[in-house]
C-alpha cells in the first residue's frame, strides 16, 4: 500500500513516502542521508506520549540513535519563545551542518523545526515525519517553514525544503475526530482548487476515509500531495501558481487572528470555512454558480465539519475588523489583498481585483447569522 510522490526541484528534490508502517522503517529510510548515525528530533508532548518510543525503535532498527525535545502542543508554541528553546537545544546537541533534524509532529512542529533547521548554522537538512492529516497533505511538503509574529500568522520564516517526508498513515488513527476533520479541510481544498474529479471522489469516499478505511486514506493523502508537489515544482517560492494553495486562507488567517490562534478555531477548520466563504464571494461576483458554494457547504456539513462563522464559539469582531486583519496576510502585494476565487469547483485562480465592499458584504451576512 506504499506510495511515493517525487517533488522535482532539481538539486533540492526529495520523495514523500506515504503508507502505514513508515515509522517502523524510519531508520532504514533516513540512514542513507546521515554522515553519522544520529538524529535530533523535535516533537510535541502529545505526539511524544503516543509515538516517540515507536520512532526510537524504528530508528534503532536501522542503526540510528536519537535525542528528542518535546515542546508543548498547540499553535501558541509556534512563536519566538519555543523557537529559541528549540534552537538552543539543537546547539546543545551539537547538531552540525552534515546532520539531520527530524520534525515529528503536526504542522506546528513541522513549521518550527523546519525554520530552526533553515537558520541553524545557516542551513541544516531536515526530515519531516508528519503525524496529523493536515501536516501529511499540506505543511510537510513544499518547504514553507516559519513561526507566527504578533502581527500575524507565518510572517517570520524561510523556504527550506526537507530531504525526505515519511507520511505514516497508520498514525492518523490516533487523532481525535476534530483534528482529523481539521486536516480534511486541507484535503477538500485540493479538489476545490484544481481537481473536480477528486472532489467528486471525496463526496463518495469521505465517510469511509473518516471511518478509518486505510486504502482511502492513502489515496487521499497521495492525491493531495501529488497536486501540491506539481504546483511547488512549477512555483517553489509562491510567485505565481503556488498562491492557489492558499484557497480559503485569506479568510482563514483573519479568523485565526480574531480568535487569538486558540482552540476556538483550528487551522484546518478555518480553511474549510474560508473555502466556503471564497466560493460564496465568487458566486456573488458572478464567477461561479450559486450551486457551487451550496455543494461545498453540503459536503463539509455531511462530514460533520465547520462551514460558517456561526460554527465558531464566542464573539467575533466586525466585518471591517476582519478585512483589516486580512491586510496582514502574506499574499498582500503593494497593499492590495490577493484572493483565491473560483470559476467553479476545481477552477481556482488568483486575483487582486476584489472590491472591499463585496468582501464586507459576504462577511456581514455571515456575521448576521451568528
Curated annotation (Swiss-Prot):
Cysteine pairs bridged by disulfides in the record: none
Residues that coordinate or bind NAD(+): 107-111, 131-132, 144, 153
Named cofactor requirement(s): Co(2+); Zn(2+); NAD(+)
A biological process term (GO) from this entry: chorismate biosynthetic process
Keywords: Amino-acid biosynthesis, Aromatic amino acid biosynthesis, Cobalt, Cytoplasm, Lyase, Metal-binding, NAD, Nucleotide-binding, Zinc
Functional pathway: Metabolic intermediate biosynthesis; chorismate biosynthesis; chorismate from D-erythrose 4-phosphate and phosphoenolpyruvate: step 2/7
PANTHER family per UniProt: 3-DEHYDROQUINATE SYNTHASE, 3-DEHYDROQUINATE SYNTHASE, CHLOROPLASTIC
Protein name, as recorded: 3-dehydroquinate synthase
Gene from which the chain derives: aroB
